Amino acid sequence: MNPVIKKFQFGQSTVTLETGRIARQATGAVLVTVDNDVTVLVTVVGAKQADPGKGFFPLSVHYQEKTYAAGKIPGGFFKREGRPSEKETLTSRLIDRPIRPLFPEGFMNEVQVVCTVVSTSKKTDPDIAAMIGTSAALAISGIPFEGPIGAARVAFHESTGYLLNPTYEQLAASSLDMVVAGTSDAVLMVESEAQELTEDQMLGAVLFAHDEFQAVIQAVKELAAEAGKPTWDWKPAVANTELFNAIRAEFGEAVSQGYTITVKADRYARLGELRDQAIAKFSGEEGQPSASEVKEIFGEIEYRTVRENIVNGKPRIDGRDTKTVRPLNIEVGVLPKTHGSALFTRGETQALVVATLGTARDAQLLDTLEGEKKDPFMLHYNFPPFSVGECGRMGGAGRREIGHGRLARRSVQAMLPAADVFPYTIRVVSEITESNGSSSMASVCGASLALMDAGVPMKAPVAGIAMGLVKEGEKFAVLTDILGDEDHLGDMDFKVAGTAKGVTALQMDIKINGITEEIMEIALGQALEARLNILGQMNQIIGQSRTELSANAPTMIAMKIDTDKIRDVIGKGGATIRAICEETKASIDIEDDGSIKIFGETKEAAEAARQRVLGITAEAEIGKIYVGKVERIVDFGAFVNILPGKDGLVHISMLSDARVEKVTDILKEGQEVEVLVLDVDNRGRIKLSIKDVAAAKASGV
């Protein structure tokens, strides 16, 4: 196959799609280059046969950043890339979410997408290039796929408006970081963080991105027309309508009644009984359908029952209408020895959230393609199996936990104080102790409460809400505060977090086409109403950050010294600063501009370290009396230490008003004496007097 190259303009960038030169044994492979700044190789491989033992669609997406792409050698002992970084995991999810709903219903062949960043100038994020490449590789592969998709990143400035595919530098000055993906007709996925933008501004960004990435979709279609493989001859299994109708006639009413049970565990138990009865009645004997087929059809009956009830205006599974938030129970300060804690319960979803403050040395060190950087804010989300009443694997965080933790982090990050105002490292951990829908948004509310309980001076409290959608034909219902079942059975998962003033995070995943601007407007409006309701209840418990940090939190003292004194504080080979830290049990961080941060586990430890630093950096003041120690006696006087590292000379003539024959008649080494600073010459030599102390005291010095 001869290489095929397609170039197109995407905003200010030139994008090149190339296929037929690299990775030719993959089902589909595309090399994407954006302005010679970023190059990503995307491959797609699809299994020709489905695994009959799998009852789900086995799609996997792997995004990987090779260090050679940025001209770096990996760290560590083995000097090669290891397990996926958090950034790689999040980008894999970002690519997976818009493509998954576009594979046809019933397609169970394994599909693996691998996106490899092979070259980068470190100016822009390679994720958009990887998404474009995934769309193109799937489009030319012949695998059944209802694409292609386009993707774009959007920034926003009050003065200049929306900006397409910004650089890292432009993003740093932006009040919005949003990634949008979708087809020519519809938006399928949104991931964003913002600095209190309005709902209209957020919706405007989504529509702006959708308009702009039409150029991507058109270019991918042209590439597929020229280099695409024939579409697979795949057809979905013929629906067994006879079995469906028989099971629905027998169990439809009972299923409908089962979905009026408001307690999740009781509802699941009843539906489980009905499912077992259906399997027993309609399978098992020779010539009858398999148990898995009956189970699948029973699930379809559940799906249709819940959706029909909702769009026809009947109460939801737990009896609520479409706009009501489940009952809230909010507590703060629930764990006595932590720095800040909150227990946030919304219906059957509960999060125990804990905030911990640390020193600058506790910041997370990130080794990225752009270089090493420190992250002073971490938010970790844990979802143990007991939260849904199940036994399960315990271990490291999975992709879902990393994704939910990042969404919660995005939601509260904009409201954290600046590092120069509050220079602590902050770690928030959300333990999901019960779950029935929207645990990530419970984590947002709990994180805001725990941070305020810890005394972190938040700019404003933050709350989050998850919205859902059920659409049947022209009928639709937007649901506030969705349950787990409504998330699973619905057409949209739409999470919005923010303050009373504006939105700080928006995440949207849509499973169907036909989500109109009107539906998104309604969802954002209902979300605002729910968010203000939740914020009102949170503010009744703790309306603003505590004025003092927890007694368990480390004490931080900030100070500044002259830059020429830094070497004195550090000492030869770091000996001085190491001695201060060991003796006071505090930690000291010194910046090149002379800024010093002292962290102590107690106030006393931090203050002791501060006094030591002050002593080292202080200058002898002429006319001031000091208590010093005699360090050395010589024939012509005595050297007295008045400040750390600073000795002055008391000449023999300055010891007493009477004549002194020998210095040792008056002073001994190690003796403490009061001395007056008479002068400091231009070489820093200090001239002291003992005999003038009394007169200086009398004059009020």
Swiss-Prot record:
Its main location: cytoplasm. GO terms for biological process: mRNA catabolic process; RNA processing. The keyword Chloroplast does not apply. One of its GO terms (molecular function) is RNA binding. Residues 554-613 form the KH domain. It is found in: Cytoplasm. Gene3D superfamilies: GHMP Kinase, N-terminal domain, K Homology domain, type 1, Nucleic acid-binding proteins. Its EC number is 2.7.7.8. Pfam families: KH_1, PNPase, RNase_PH, RNase_PH_C, S1. InterPro entries: ExoRNase_PH_dom1, ExoRNase_PH_dom2, ExoRNase_PH_dom2_sf, KH_dom, KH_dom_type_1, KH_dom_type_1_sf, NA-bd_OB-fold, PNPase. It catalyses: RNA(n+1) + phosphate = RNA(n) + a ribonucleoside 5'-diphosphate. Mg(2+) binds at residues 487, 493. Keywords: Cytoplasm, Magnesium, Metal-binding, Nucleotidyltransferase, RNA-binding, Transferase. GO terms for cellular component: cytosol. Transmembrane segments: none annotated. SUPFAM superfamilies: Eukaryotic type KH-domain (KH-domain type I), Nucleic acid-binding proteins, Ribonuclease PH domain 2-like, Ribosomal protein S5 domain 2-like. CDD domains: KH-I_PNPase (cd02393), RNase_PH_PNPase_1 (cd11363), RNase_PH_PNPase_2 (cd11364), S1_PNPase (cd04472). The keyword Ubl conjugation does not apply. Belongs to the polyribonucleotide nucleotidyltransferase family. Involved in mRNA degradation. Catalyzes the phosphorolysis of single-stranded polyribonucleotides processively in the 3'- to 5'-direction. NCBIfam families: polynuc_phos, PRK11824.1. This is Polyribonucleotide nucleotidyltransferase.
